[in-house]
Swiss-Prot record:
Keywords: DNA-binding, Metal-binding, Nickel, Transcription, Transcription regulation. SUPFAM superfamilies: ACT-like, Ribbon-helix-helix. Ni(2+) binds at residues 81, 92, 94, 100. Binds 1 nickel ion per subunit. This is Putative nickel-responsive regulator 1.
């Protein structure tokens, strides 16, 4: 069965496209289109996994964001205060003049952890947001999901 391919257009900053092209060459993709398809499949798989986090979990959210984005720091703080019952610790560093790098350690119900992660991911100015969790269960060994 042959799948019909759809042509789409995407606008990207030069630096992002340059980095993507370096990865394409390093990984040996036959074309930019194949690399984009692979990236989209990975993105879909990750988001499907996020939709199925259930039960008690521990984990982290890694966030890189532009603190010069007007109001973003305040919104992030408000979101974290709303979910403060999940947050066990956080580390916040300043790698350069624009960006903030934050690691938030979480523990709680998987559904709420996912809600927190999705609220952060949706914000304009968040350059990277990655959730990593493991199920926390007293009777079983934890299973790490990345």
């Amino acid at each position: 069965m042959e799948t019909e391919l759809m042509r789409i257009g995407v606008s990207l900053p030069d630096t992002l496209l340059g980095k993507f092209d370096e990865i394409i060459e390093k990984r040996g993709y036959s074309s930019r289109s194949e690399a984009i398809r692979d990236s989209i499949r990975s993105y879909i798989s990750y988001n499907e996994w996020m939709g199925n986090i259930k039960g008690h979990h521990v984990g982290t959210i890694v966030i890189i964001y532009d603190h010069t984005q007007r109001g973003l720091s305040n919104v992030l703080t408000d979101i974290q205060h709303h979910y403060s019952h999940l947050i066990r610790s956080s580390i916040h560093i300043y790698p350069d003049r624009e960006d903030c790098f934050e690691i938030v350690v979480l523990e709680g119900e998987g559904k709420e952890i996912t809600e927190l992660a999705e609220a952060i991911m949706a914000l304009k100015g968040v350059k990277l947001s990655k959730l990593i969790t493991t199920e926390s269960n007293e009777t079983d060994e934890p299973s790490i999901v990345i």
